[in-house]
Amino acid sequence: MGYRFQPSSRHFVGTVEQKHRELLHNQIQNVYHLFDVSVSRMITRRWTVNASLPVFLAYRNQLYVPRGEFRVRSIGDVTVGGRAWIFRPPTESGANIGLGLNLKLPTGKYNALGVATDRNGNVIVATADQSIQAGDGGTGFSVDVQAYRPFYGRTMLYFSGTYLFNPRNTNGVSTFRTRRGEQVMSVADQYLARGGVSRALPKFRHITVTFGGRIEGVPVRDLIGRSDGFRRPGYAISLDPGFMVAYKGSVFSCNVPFAVERNRRRSVTDIANGTHGDAAFADYALILGFSRSF
């Protein structure tokens, strides 16, 4: 199981921070809590099947019309799939590469609503912003890779990467936006890659420290299908320190990636309209994990 906490309030256009938003007290604040319950079963030493159920809680204070505080509580998009190691573990070199394929089902709420006020101060029911929806409304699939190899002594090199393909173009959910092409939400691809080094502490044999980097984001254009509708493409590059504690079949992990570069790229609709929208990015995230082998 896993948990991710992430607050975001610093706005960027491209890589330029919009510092005036904070000075004018009109920056948008998003707060995310993501719980993930997963189960996996080893079929053979090389093959594993898995399933994951995320639970999503989010808050957003929206300071423009429709103005209000939005809260979303929902399960997220369920994934089921499998993974195979290229070499049968354990390998003589201590290194291996794993490939995974997962199906993403549109089980998360992607049309959550909230109470807000319009330009005239009237109380209305409005669609929550795309950034705090628990799902995207699309059936997709992801491919992932994991790799590790011994480097020196107790030091290990590691890498993992995931790309989520979302072939659906838009999900039909109306936004509050009037700019051409942004009236409905886009169903966007997503990606994540991280890598670094880990080292077991000699005096604390159950503890391993890790340090690396990660990049995660949303592309301007999907690899499969069209990329119409409203989306906020871009990426964040972070340094990613952490540690793991392993004891008698249980593993606890903690990572606190903190951003060193944020880039809100121009979307397809931005390019068509000659504009460049902004996006709020997080300074850091707290990522916890716990697993138990039976």
Question: Where on the chain are the PLM-derived regions?
Answer:
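Transmembrane beta-strands of outer-membrane beta-barrel proteins
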Residues: M1, V49-A51, V80, A95-L101, ...
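Transmembrane beta-strands of outer-membrane beta-barrel pores
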Residues: Y3-S9, V55-Y59, I86, L103-K109, ...
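Surface-exposed strand-loop-strand hairpins of Gram-negative outer-membrane beta-barrel proteins
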Residues: F5-L34, S131
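Short loop/turn motifs that connect adjacent beta-strands in outer-membrane beta-barrel proteins
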Residues: S8-R10, R46, F87-I97, A112, ...
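Outer membrane beta-barrel transmembrane domains
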Residues: F12-E22, R168-F294
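Long, hydrophobic/aromatic-enriched structural stretches that serve as scaffold segments
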Residues: L23-W85
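Hydrophobic, lipid-facing positions within transmembrane beta-strands of outer-membrane proteins
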Residues: H33-V37, G76-G82, I97, T139-V145, ...
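Outer-membrane pore/translocation modules
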Residues: L57-S186
